[in-house]
Amino acid sequence: MSKALRTLALSGLVLVGLSACVSVPRGQGSGAAVVEQISDSARQGEAARQAWLQQHPNWSFQGRVAISKDRNGGSGRIDWQQDGPRYRVQLSAPVTRQSWVLTGDTTTGAGRLEGLDGGPRSGSDAEKVLLEATGWTIPVNQMPDWVRALRIADAGAARVELDAAGRPRTVQQDGWTIDFLAWTPASADQPELPQRIEARYGEAKVRLLVDQWTVSP
């Protein structure tokens, strides 16, 4: 079987498995509006949020994700665990009981994908491994910062729009447009964190709905 046919087959298997899962609901305009003027208190609050998150590099979240490209797509559960630069991401389809695990390191960029027919795939570029195995375009090395809306302004973003609380609302970076549509409220244990994110790159789209955040002390 040719490489192209193998990629198409693997992508189809993953998307079919994920399509059996619960879908991620589309937004109904719950995101905060973009504003031109940010108050000093809002800027200070966002700076404090960023500083707190930088001091807490170990975290996890559970939620739902939908991935699509052109007319192909699927959705499923996602469990993301981050330990400094190292991550473990599990995508699962409860109905079919299929799951896929991506592990990697954002410092080196390397990654390993398990759960596909034909055995694990690994390489020095996790994004390339994922693209070749599934056909998905996902910026996995940027995702740890993106999902927390962390260091957006310092990461070479082409455009950053803020809401009235000083938080990122829309970001354009590396060809992606990321919309932060809803946030979990701050608690005694952690600051506000994104709850619903939509990212687009051409025909590729990733929609994420976080059910629970956990940040280690």
Swiss-Prot record:
A lipid is attached at residue 21 (S-diacylglycerol cysteine). It is a lipid-anchor. Coiled coil: none annotated. Pfam families: LolB. GO terms for cellular component: cell outer membrane. Plays a critical role in the incorporation of lipoproteins in the outer membrane after they are released by the LolA protein. Monomer. Residues 1-20 form the signal peptide. It comes from Xanthomonas oryzae pv. oryzae (strain KACC10331 / KXO85). The gene is lolB. Belongs to the LolB family. This is Outer-membrane lipoprotein LolB. HAMAP family: LolB.
